[in-house]
């Protein structure tokens, strides 16, 4: 019986470790930006630079106004596009990243883009908090959008 309990303990511990790794994000909580805050910032005197790290088809279909295509962050060509998009920006630029292709905890694009921007020395990078997807968490809530090209 003790042997079975030990085995279950180790299996449970392994499962907890695996689940914890899925939920670890490289950004601090204060680096998450809520959709309502970004929607308000779009109308400010100095709106942030908005970078869409989603797949090109998503960017071209519908996006946040003035967002630049900078992805997909999971592909080398997307990282090259990201680097090109920020090449002329000052390191203290206010940058907001978003993807929204899927639930953020599973997103393949946002974390690589976040890491690259920090490696390039950008100091003010925030991530748009899109828990489910862009349709549900941004467009479906009536926040500003523009059609792609």
Spell out what each predicted region is:
Residues 34, 55-56:
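Aromatic-Pro/Gly-enriched surface loop or interdomain linker
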Residues 2-9:
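Bacterial N-terminal signal peptides that target proteins for export
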Residues 12-21:
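Hydrophobic h-region of N-terminal signal peptides that target proteins for export
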Residues 38, 49-54, 67-70:
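Short hydrophobic beta-strand that contains or immediately precedes a catalytic carboxylate
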Residues 42-50, 66, 124:
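Short active-site oxyanion
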């Amino acid at each position: 019986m003790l042997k079975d309990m030990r085995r279950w303990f180790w299996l449970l511990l392994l499962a907890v470790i695996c689940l914890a790794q899925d939920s670890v994000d490289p950004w601090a909580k204060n680096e998450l930006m809520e959709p309502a805050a970004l929607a308000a910032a779009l109308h400010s005197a100095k709106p942030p630079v908005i970078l869409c790290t989603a797949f090109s088809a998503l960017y071209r279909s519908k996006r946040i106004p003035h967002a630049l295509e900078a992805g997909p962050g999971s592909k080398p060509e997307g990282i090259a596009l990201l680097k090109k998009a920020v090449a002329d920006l000052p390191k203290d630029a206010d940058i907001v990243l978003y993807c929204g292709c899927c639930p953020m905890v599973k997103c393949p694009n946002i974390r690589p883009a976040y890491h690259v921007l920090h490696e390039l020395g950008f100091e003010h990078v925030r991530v748009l908090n899109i828990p489910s997807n862009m349709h549900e968490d941004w467009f479906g809530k009536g926040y500003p959008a523009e059609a792609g090209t």
